[in-house]
Amino acid sequence: MASSDERKSGLLVAYDVMAVPGRAINLVADLLKEGFLAPSPLGGEVLFFEHEGRMLGRTLTGGDGRAMVPFTPRAVGRVTVTVRVGESRRVTAQETTAGVFVWDRKRPIVIISMKALVSAPRRPDLGLPLPRSGAKPQNTDGGAVQALTVLAKRAHLIYVTASDRLELSEVRQWADRNRLPACPVFPLKPVPMSLSHELERWRREGWTNIRGG
């Protein structure tokens, strides 16, 4: 087998998902290689999807680098899924996690913009709230965190971010550090009406009680 120094360094991106008990959903992850202009997909690699050491499924990444495994949650709550690359001669990548948020559809859902939660900088900042340049992310506004904590007691929350999908893990870590309520994080594509398209998709999936925060 090739040594780790000879293998490509890949990046796993796993996506949060909303679900209801007893209904199948797809667990989705991408295996990518960062490029100068855009990430390139790594196809033909085995990805393992696990929960607390139990195998949920495994499958090959397609030509687009994406792998999907069907999963049916049984009870309301949060399921943390770990995704990792199987033994490979070509690729090495750090494992990552995503959440399956199993909810009751009767409860309202409120969309929260991650960017709106960031404290205003003392000087102009032309970058995104969570740049990949290594700059330290700003903290959240303390009052916003308190308000979200109260809101989360009577509604489900979903976070949307304009950050690139490659930054999802960093965004989740940032949310944890700032003690935001644990909720799914969805990246928006850098295209016009991206949030509207996501809303349409969620409503087609049966999430009809979503509104903006």
Question: What are these model-derived regions, one by one?
Answer:
Residues 1-26, 100-104:
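Beta-strand-rich domain onsets/edges
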Residues 19-39, 47, 83:
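Beta-strand-rich structural segments
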Residues 46-57:
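Short amphipathic beta-strand segments in non-cytosolic proteins
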Residues 60-73, 77:
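Glycine-centered loop-to-beta-strand initiation motif
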Residues 75-89:
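Short, aromatic- and glycine-rich surface loops/edge beta-strands on solvent-exposed regions
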Residues 90-101:
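Edge beta-strands of extracellular beta-sandwich domains
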Residues 108-125:
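Asp-based phosphoryl-transfer active-site loop
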Residues 129, 133, 141, 158, ...:
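C-terminal cap/substrate-recognition subdomain and adjoining C-terminal extension
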